[in-house]
Design a protein with these regions (language model features):
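Conserved class I S-adenosyl-L-methionine
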Residues: 1-36, 47-55, 71-74, 78, ...
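Conserved Class I S-adenosyl-L-methionine
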Residues: 3-7, 19, 45-47, 169-266
Length: 266
């Protein structure tokens, strides 16, 4: 799981184990058709765009946009290796650089919860989709559906006084989610609960990566020197030894994941 480039680690480790299978779920829900123009918002390394491009065919168009240039660089390389014609742009979801009605379909996989202004991002997706077009997105259900991560979050809060994962699971309330989409102008909102099990190789590396990612943005962690950060990491790892063993089957961590897959019309 180790890499000097987090985007490459994401593509090589997280996409095959988690985000690739969930991309298939999202694309099946969206049902892209030949000739359609499709936008993948907060595309990351582009797995959703890569799943869609052959479905819309040579008469269609697929564009991926993300704020992270390192993610986009990996997305471009992956698409080139696979011989896929996808356009990549850098930019924020809250200010999409496209004209009104430029797309038939907008997709967004596990990113809405991270946007600084979720409603603004949805309004932008609404704006760039033509009347009669549609949106499909996925968000994780709440921490109550993810006990391993709830335990990890409790361990992080004990050591650092602040949550490390609650944003990831912040849109589990279906009423809030529906109101958010409707307030952005979408109609006929359908929310489907979907569950899937993921198998992560190398349990020790998996936990180390989760701790690194989930504590990186916490101010109290950032203010520590290297030795103190290592001490916090070791303490959290010790707290998680029993939950990690319980989730380990052979050489893999096996965890259930629960999401809401949303489809709505423009």
């Amino acid at each position: 799981m180790s890499s000097t480039n987090p985007a490459e680690t994401y593509e090589s480790y997280m996409v095959p184990t988690l985000f690739g299978p969930w991309a298939d779920v999202l694309v099946r829900s969206a049902q892209p058709r030949p000739g359609e123009r499709v936008l993948d918002v907060a595309c990351g390394t582009g797995i959703v765009a890569r799943r869609v491009v052959n479905l819309v065919g040579s008469d269609g168009q697929v564009v991926g946009i993300d704020l992270n240039p390192n993610m986009l660089a990996v997305a471009r390389s992956a698409a080139e290796r696979e011989g896929l014609a996808i356009e990549w742009q850098e930019g924020p979801a809250e200010r999409l650089p496209f004209p009104d009605g430029a797309f038939d379909l907008s997709l967004c996989q596990f990113a809405l919860m991270f946007f600084a202004d979720r409603r603004a991002a949805l309004q932008e997706m609404h704006r760039v989709v033509r009347p009669g077009g549609r949106i499909a997105l996925s968000v994780w259900q709440g921490l109550d559906h993810h006990p391993f991560y709830r335990t990890l979050d409790e361990a992080i809060q004990r050591r650092l006084g602040m949550s490390g994962v609650q944003d990831i699971f912040a849109l589990g309330d279906t009423k809030e989610l529906r109101m958010l989409l409707e307030s952005a102008g979408f109609r006929a909102v359908e929310i489907e609960p979907v569950a899937m099990t993921a198998r992560f190789p190398n349990p020790v590396a998996f936990l180390a990566g989760e701790i690194d990612v989930d504590t990186a943005a916490i101010p109290s962690m950032q203010h520590l020197d290297a030795e103190a950060r290592r001490g916090v990491t070791v303490a959290i790892r010790e707290d998680m030894e029993r939950p990690l063993r319980a989730a380990t089957e052979g050489e893999h961590v096996v965890l259930p994941f629960h999401a809401h897959v949303v489809r709505a019309d423009r």
